[in-house]
C-alpha cells in the first residue's frame, strides 16, 4: 500500500495551480540600454533606446548631441535611424539658413561708419554653419585692406533666396533703430564740437585785433611835431640846472642822518658786552659761596625760585630801577644766601651742607 499521508505532511507547502496561472510572470529580461521610467497606471511604456552609432554614415557631419540618439517608436531598423538623423540635420540646416537671412537683412540697413565687422569675432565653425564657402573667405582676405565693407556684405549673403517676412521682425527693427539713433547722436556731437572750435577761433581773432589796436594807440600819441619837443627840451634844461643843487642838499642831509644813526647803534653794543661780563660774575656769585673755613662751595638756594639772570642785562639798575620787580630781585639773593640755611651740624658737631628733600 502507498503511504501518502506522511509524505504530504513532510512537505509543508501547498501550491495552488489556479493562483499560479493568475500571477504574471516576467518572461523577458531588461536590457541594459533602456531607461527605467516610473509610469502611472494606464500609461504606456515608451520604447526609447539611447544607442550611440559607432560608424556614422558617409556625407553626414555630426553637429549636435541629438544626432547621437535615435527615437524608435516601433521596430529598430537601419532605415529608421537614417530617417531620424536626416530629419535632425535638416532642422539644423534650416535654422542656420534663417540666421543667415536675418543677418543679410540687418546689415544693409546700418550706417557705413557705425558698422562693426561681424567676422572679427566669428570662428570657422560658425562660418561653415552659416553656409559660407572657403573660397569667399579667401577673396575677403585678399581685399580686406581696400574694401572691407563690400567684401563682408558679399560674405554674409547666402545662396538661399531672401525672405521678405523675416526682414521685418521686431528685434531687427529695434536693433537698427538703436544703431541709427547712436550714429545720429555721434554726428550731432561732432557738429557741436566743430561749431565750438569755430567760435573759439573767431573770438581769438577778435582779441588779437583788439590787442593790435591798443598797441598802436600809444605810438600815435608819441608821434608829435619836432617844434613842440624842442621847446619842451629848452624849458626842461633850465629846470635840470636847479635840480642838482637840491639833490646834493638832500644827499648831505641823508648821509648825516645815517652817520648819526650808526653812531647811536654802535654805543649800545659796547654797553651790552660790558653788561654780559658783569652778568657772568653775578651768576658765579650766585652759584658759589664760601664756607666758614674760607673755601669755595656750591650755593644751595632751594627756597628761592629759579630766576633767569642771563636775560637781565642791567643787574644794578635793571631795565626799570624804580619798579618793585627790580627791588625784589636785589633783595632776594642776599636774604637767601645765609650760612644757617646752607649748613648744619651732624651728630659729632661737624658743619655739613644741609640737604632738604
Curated annotation (Swiss-Prot):
GO-annotated molecular function: damaged DNA binding
Region (Interaction with RBBP8/CtIP): 281-357
Region (Interaction with AURKA): 187-357
Record-linked InterPro entries: AUNIP
Tissue expression notes: Expressed in heart, skeletal muscles, placenta and testis.
Compositionally biased region (Polar residues): 71-91
Protein name: Aurora kinase A- and ninein-interacting protein
